[in-house]
Amino acid sequence: MCTKNQAIGILEEVYIACSSILKEYIKDVYLYGSYARGDYSKESDVDILVTAALDRSELSKFRYALASISSDLSLKHSVTVSLTVKPYDDFMLYSSALPFYSNVIKEGIRYGA
């Protein structure tokens, strides 16, 4: 378990690590779920969503590198870091229609915002 401030620090680490892989394609990075809402417990994972200006097939080329970020940070911080990466266009298209996306926007903490 970590604190909300530590989860926000992990959010920054994810942004830096993903930026080195996705470069200029990275659009947004959100902390969402229980740590963003403040109702986390010792069982909670740190949920992070990254959006990138790439389509699904282009993003799939980076899946192993992105999974490595998640596992490395989980080990470093002794908390499960659940990293989800979505195409930015899909995120924007579905943000008002699908609860997952709308909750990320409504409850999430956007890095750099």
Q: Residue locations for each model-derived region?
A:
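Short beta-strand->loop micro-motif that forms the acidic, two-metal-ion catalytic signature
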Residues: V46-T51
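Catalytic core of pol beta-like nucleotidyltransferases
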Residues: M1-Y30, R37-K42, A53-A113
